[in-house]
């Protein structure tokens, strides 16, 4: 069974988002070994942080992210400059990896400051959930639902209309 990880910076604090993610995580269990890895957000003491302070925090988060990726996994970074993909595109990406025999995948959601360039460079794909700005907890919920939707598309189920 294919391993799919969601690596995210920060905790799910909002109960309603966490419940939604938990529901789709449970549903995904029938299609893949789905795992969520939550890494701590590097705290910046100064509310008016400089670009340098933010870059340093992103670098530390990036190191933690890259250390958490399974060896040989296909890394997908969610970022603003990523390619906008449809549910069918995501399903094809997952199916292609599963068929290749090296099916492990890791999807990464960064902190409110985004992702370090080292993660973007290491990623084999960069995708975007769209041009709108989403809170990171909501982005995790949307991504988890889309992963479930992609798996149902690949299984020929009627969930996707």
Question: What residues fall within each predicted segment?
Answer:
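General small-molecule cofactor/ligand-binding pocket signal
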Residues: 7, 35-37
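N-terminal beta1-alpha1 ligand-phosphate binding loop
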Residues: 1-28
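Short, well-ordered alpha-helix to beta-strand connector turns
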Residues: 32, 72-73, 123
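S-adenosyl-L-methionine/SAH cofactor-binding core of RNA-modifying enzymes
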Residues: 40-105
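Short glycine-rich anion-binding loops that position phosphate/pyrophosphate groups of nucleotides
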Residues: 12, 80-83, 111-114
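Conserved beta-strand scaffold positions in the cores of enzyme catalytic domains, especially
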Residues: 36, 75-77, 126
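Structured adenosyl-cofactor binding patch, chiefly the S-adenosyl-L-methionine
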Residues: 113, 117-161
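Conserved RecA-like P-loop NTPase ATPase core
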Residues: 6, 76, 110, 143
């Amino acid at each position: 069974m294919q391993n799919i990880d969601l690596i995210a910076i920060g905790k799910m604090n909002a109960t309603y988002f966490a419940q939604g993610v938990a529901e789709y995580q449970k549903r995904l269990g029938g299609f893949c070994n789905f795992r969520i890895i939550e890494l701590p957000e590097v705290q910046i003491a100064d509310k008016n942080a400089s670009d340098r302070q933010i870059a340093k925090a992103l670098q530390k988060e990036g190191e933690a992210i890259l250390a958490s990726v399974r060896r040989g996994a296909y890394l997908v970074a969610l970022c603003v400059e990523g390619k906008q993909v449809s549910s069918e595109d995501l399903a094809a990406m997952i199916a292609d990896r599963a068929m290749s025999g090296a099916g492990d995948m890791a999807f990464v959601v960064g902190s409110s400051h985004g992702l370090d360039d080292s993660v973007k460079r290491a990623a084999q794909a960069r995708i975007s959930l769209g041009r709108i700005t989403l809170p990171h907890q909501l982005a995790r919920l949307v991504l988890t639902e889309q992963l479930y939707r992609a798996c149902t598309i690949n299984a020929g189920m009627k969930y996707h209309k």
